[in-house]
Design a protein with these regions (language model features):
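Flavin-dependent oxidoreductase catalytic cores
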Residues: 1-160
Length: 160
């Protein structure tokens, strides 16, 4: 059985486990702050865009959109927290279905329902929260992941 990462209470314990696996993954003993030169706080250039740090929010499906695929207060609160987190890359913060019958669950965001106004609301929510918490969002990128769940679609599944 593979142990959960949270089980390791120190860098030494994780290092010992990795040694037993014959893994050469380097582990730092302490977590550096941005002021101490953390590599995670360094800018990252991708193509012509430079992102202010290396923290990223990945796409999720929160099962908390409206039944017609629009944002709810719960969903907007999550997006606000994305901004407050300090991550400069929100890489598809939400998986958004392109058509209703391609939704992975009945409470997934739906692109036709969102429309331009809904997309703008999501982007403005994360960007304004980031500016309030960190001063500027000029070096951040916000994107959505457009999805179709194919044979795994469950647009009418029961409550979770």
């Amino acid at each position: 059985m593979v142990p959960r990462i949270a089980r390791f209470r120190s860098a030494a314990a994780l290092r010992a486990h990795l040694a037993a696996l014959e893994s050469a993954l380097p582990i730092d003993d302490t977590i550096l702050s941005a002021a101490e030169g953390s590599p995670m706080a360094m800018p990252l250039t991708i193509g012509t865009r430079t992102i202010g740090n290396r923290w990223c929010i990945h796409p999720m499906e929160g099962w908390d959109a409206t039944t017609d695929g629009g944002p709810t207060d719960t969903l907007l609160r999550r997006w606000r927290h994305f901004g407050i987190s300090g991550a400069k890359l929100v890489w598809g913060g939400e998986a958004v279905a392109v058509v209703a019958d391609g939704r992975a669950n009945p409470r997934q965001l739906l692109s036709p329902t969102l429309g331009e106004g809904g997309y703008r609301l999501l982007v403005d929510t994360v960007r304004s929260a980031h500016r309030e918490a960190h001063g500027s969002d000029a070096d951040s990128i916000v994107a959505l992941q457009l999805t179709h769940s194919g044979r795994f679609s469950q647009p009418a599944a029961g409550p979770r």
